[in-house]
Amino acid sequence: VFPDRTPHPSLLEAKRAQQPFTLTAEICDWSISLTVTSEHLFRATDNERLNWRLGSLSDAHLEGSQVLQLPPEGSQTIVIDADSNLLAGGDQEILLDVWITTEQATHALSAGHEIARSQHVLALADTTRERETRPAEISHQGEQLLVAADEVSWHMDAATGFITDWVIDGRALLDAPVADCFVRAPLDNDICSSEVDNPSPEAWLAKWQVAGLFDLEHRCTGVEVKGATVTSQHEYLNDAGVAIRSVWSHTFDAEGGVDIAIEVSVDPEMPPLPRVGMRLLLSDKPEAVSWLGRGPHENYHDRKLSADLGAWSCDRQAMQTPYIFPSDNGLRCNVRQAVIGSVCIERIDDDFAFAVSDFGVESLMRAQHTFECMEQSALHVHVDGYHMGVGGDDSWTPSVRPEYLLNAETYRWGCRLSVAHDDRT
């Protein structure tokens, strides 16, 4: 727990991993078989209620509950009848959420306390449907490329190849260009057993510093306009030469949105990257953030057992985790859509991860204590196609499991940026 006794995200992970019930579900002839198994060795259930909800990320279609009566290490299967069209999926995932709560208060637990929870994805959403849009018109104004669509306008700098301005109803949304981001504020596990005067050469931080990852020099090598698509090519250089290349394809539509497809190529001599994503600096700081994805609390790709898929919303401050030693925090994974004030971010093909911060990477890296974190005037939003795992299975060592390392030579990802409307979620 934190000093104020609020739960640490890892405590929620531990609770889910060590809960005393196992819950499994499968579809059988358009019905759902839900099996609950008790891991209590000597105790029968006498104060537990089984609850379930069947629906999409944002809507419940069927709900139910019943008293749970199991002997020690016993199992019980219930059958949930569901509409065949619902289980066939469609535009949205179909999920079964199951949780077990206390019936009556005990000396240790209040009535309704959640003892166990599990989520089961029964049908995947169809993501192959193409969006029907009209292409936008792109004009040239010196070194600037201008896209105007209804009340929305975009500006791209032909010299840097990045979007520099995004204006809605005369209000500028960006405080800096939308650009690649490959770094994160180092975690304890990234620093591992390093000492102030004796850094460990095996630490991820040391390897990133040797590779010059935090000091890469950006160079735009070309910008091409073809119809409603602007393609820009970028190089990031360290002392040894070109470390990373990226190609951004921006396709603007007449509704004021842009689909961004990004391909990143990494020199094979580079260490695994912390992230492959983009950074947006937003001028406005909304009070709340909402998203469709894993939540409600912070989760990383190797730390998301307790983070369920759903439609979540919370205060901007709650999107950030105040670790005693300032570091990267607040990531949410497997996101389909995020709404941050006037900005809507949507997946195109694959899910993304995102984080919202009042501080930013540089401020977090400079600070040694939370009170030293300097809040920035702009809101830092990271949208990641890929993000390295946290690791730390054996305490503070560079022990990220191989499947959560970003050591490929090529990455492809993308997202859509558009104006957020009340009916988005």
Task: Give the label of every model feature segment.
Residues 1-73, 86, 352-380, 390:
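Substrate-binding clefts and catalytic carboxylate motifs of secreted carbohydrate-active enzymes
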Residues 14, 36, 98, 151, ...:
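Conserved, mostly hydrophobic/aromatic
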Residues 62-64, 113-118:
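Extracellular and select intracellular beta-sandwich modules with Ser/Thr-enriched
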Residues 71-77, 408:
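Solvent-exposed, conformationally flexible loop/turn segments
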Residues 83-91, 120-425:
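Beta-strand/loop-rich accessory regions of lumenal/periplasmic or secreted enzymes
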Residues 90-102:
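Short, aromatic- and glycine-rich surface loops/edge beta-strands on solvent-exposed regions
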Residues 106-115, 394:
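Beta-sandwich strand segments
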